[in-house]
Amino acid sequence: MESRKDMVMFLDGGQLGTLVGKRVSNLSEAVSSPLPEPPEKMVPHGCLSPRAGPPTSRERGGGGQEEEPVDGLAGSAAGLGAEPRSAGAAMLGPGPPVPSADSLSGQGQPSSSDTESDFYEEIEVSCTPDCATGNAEYQHSKAPGSDALGSSPTSGSEAPKSNGGSGGSGSQGTLACSASDQMRRYRTAFTREQIARLEKEFYRENYVSRPRRCELAAALNLPETTIKVWFQNRRMKDKRQRLAMTWPHPADPAFYTYMMSHAAAAGGLPYPFPSHLPLPYYSPVGLGAASAASAAASPFSGPLRPLDTFRVLSQPYPRPELLCAFRHPPLYPGPAHGLGASAAAAAAAGPCSCLACHSGPANGLAPRAAAAAAASDFTCASTSRSDSFLTFAPSVLSKASSVAALDQREEVPLTR
């Protein structure tokens, strides 16, 4: 006990007493402040504080000089009820240094704001067509986050870096948006006059030249690229319409002739269609030399113009005399279809009553068709067809027509 009293008296009167007094004053200051945070964390970004400067000489040297006495003090005052002093000393003792944001960024460890800016840069570069609104919403939602990042305990040099990164990413996103808006094309709404003029030009020539395209662009007040794309789409539509007619005419060209003649008679074609002239899609077998020459010299020897297939197929058959196209043997190879005796009987029966042969001089087809019929080695007949043609009976024919009973055959039912 005496040794302990001597130690207490020595502490009260000695040099260690003064040091402990200084420590106790520091402890009282620390207890008076509610949260002992480091000074650099408490300082906002544009403000300077007297405590934010470099530490004083007492704080620099106090760590090494006072560490041993504080440990000795804690060991000696353990039995004398000096737990508050030892706790305060342990609290005020030099702990591990808190690494600043500058040191973290210098060591290569990315902070949270840098990671977020990199993540948003990757998102903003891949811009959608609605990127203008997306950028506005993103900037609006990002503003509170940037304020929170600015008030968070980071260094002053980190905030301009993050703001610069987000600004650069925003400019990149704006450039990407403008490029995508320029790449996006909107559907052009043509007027009826423009469509009529373009259709007329397409019937005249499928492939329009560039000078003609420039004239059309100036006349219709349309871009030249739009006219070019319209002609491309129109050619594809023409091709689809031709392919839609592949059901009858590869096996039976006469039925295709009937369909085209019916379309021309109903007003589906902007030009007359001669049913007696051979189709340019085929090489007819059985034609004489004069007939082939007249067909080649005719203005219809080029490719056929498009027709509205669905309008033709949806209408009933009002003109039975147009079926004379089925009674023309030159469109078929003789031995293949068995036209021997039936063709001879049809030739001896009488003249034809088809539209192309007996139409008036108004449409200008009578002389040409008559010359073709006279030059060929057959005579057009008005009698009923032979049974060899009934295999390709179309279901679009009306049952009320005079030839409906012949067209409908039980062996080959066709349903569409």
UniProtKB/Swiss-Prot annotation:
Give the GO terms filed under biological process for this record. embryo development ending in birth or egg hatching; interneuron migration; positive regulation of transcription by RNA polymerase II; regulation of transcription by RNA polymerase II; spinal cord interneuron axon guidance
Span list, region Disordered: 30-120, 138-178
Q: Kindly list the GO CC terms recorded for this protein.
A: axon; neuronal cell body; nucleoplasm
From the Swiss-Prot or TrEMBL record, what is one GO molecular function term? sequence-specific double-stranded DNA binding
Q: Name the Pfam families for this protein.
A: Homeodomain
Q: Which keywords annotate this record?
A: Developmental protein, DNA-binding, Homeobox, Nucleus
Chain residues forming the annotated DNA-binding region? 183-242
Which domain of life, per UniProt? Eukaryota
Subcellular location field: Nucleus
Q: Per the record, where are the segments of Low complexity compositional bias?
A: 72-82
Q: Biased-composition ranges for Polar residues?
A: 102-114
Q: Which family does it belong to?
A: Belongs to the even-skipped homeobox family.
What this chain does, per the entry, is described as: May play a role in the specification of neuronal cell types. May play a role in the dorsoventral specification of mesodermal cell fate.
This protein is called: Homeobox even-skipped homolog protein 1
